[in-house]
Amino acid sequence: MSTLGLLIMLLGIIIMCTLVILRSVNPIYSILNLIVIYGCYASILLTVEMEFLACIYILVNVGAIAVLFLFIVMMININIVEIQETMKKYNIYMIVGIIGVVGLLGILITNYQIRIKEEVIADFSMFLINSEVVQLQATPSYLDFYSLFVETTDIRTMGSNVIYGSYSIWFIMACIILLIGMVGVIYITEDLIIEKRTLNERRRQDINSQVLREYKITIRNYRESK
């Protein structure tokens, strides 16, 4: 598949998921479609050789949406049986997700080559020489220093030189702030759920305790009703 055809397919998936989000009432389906949209957008970034931004979109946006999905499940009373019955109607989205994953793997396979360690290559070369499979020839060998400086990836440049190098302290502080925010929201949500359950238990009517507390009045009212 050509790059243009892959981009058209990913854009079509994004447009379809956007229309589903606009028409959907259930927030869970909206979140699932958002995850598909971000995955397709990360695939588009991989096709234009922006690996670092693609990884950031997957880690930050999809991770944040997964946490939001968890909060919605915690705060909304959702029947699991209804979800399972409704998910049977959305098999097309599973097919779209599989196509997106296959496309992403195709991009990774076409853009990256498998790197073999130099020790393995050296051992294999010595095996070929000793077994006289290949004949040695006098060929000039040199080291291309230009390729060492030019042929680099976006992830290596941004990660090793910028984030984990010059701005490592700020990166660690941002991670700590995000962790505090996630833990704080989970703690507040859990307290609200426990308080709501306690309030419902208090409002529950216990007939035995009411009868024992006002036994004479209950017997009298029962006799008068007859």
From Swiss-Prot:
Gene Ontology cellular-component annotations: mitochondrial membrane
Membrane topology: Multi-pass membrane protein
EC number(s) stated in the UniProt entry for this protein: 7.1.1.2
Catalytic activity entry: a ubiquinone + NADH + 5 H(+)(in) = a ubiquinol + NAD(+) + 4 H(+)(out)
GO molecular function: NADH dehydrogenase (ubiquinone) activity
Top-rank EC class of the record's enzyme: translocase
Localisation per UniProt entry: Mitochondrion membrane
Transmembrane segments: 2-22, 28-48, 56-76, 90-110, 169-189
Pfam family, one: Oxidored_q3
Keywords: Electron transport, Membrane, Mitochondrion, NAD, Respiratory chain, Translocase, Transmembrane, Transmembrane helix, Transport, Ubiquinone
Gene3D superfamilies, A to Z: NADH-ubiquinone/plastoquinone oxidoreductase chain 6, subunit NuoJ (1.20.120.1200)
PANTHER family: NADH-UBIQUINONE OXIDOREDUCTASE CHAIN 6
Cited function: Core subunit of the mitochondrial membrane respiratory chain NADH dehydrogenase (Complex I) that is believed to belong to the minimal assembly required for catalysis. Complex I functions in the transfer of electrons from NADH to the respiratory chain. The immediate electron acceptor for the enzyme is believed to be ubiquinone.
Family, per entry: Belongs to the complex I subunit 6 family.
Protein name: NADH-ubiquinone oxidoreductase chain 6
Classification of source organism: Eukaryota, Amoebozoa, Evosea, Eumycetozoa, Dictyostelia
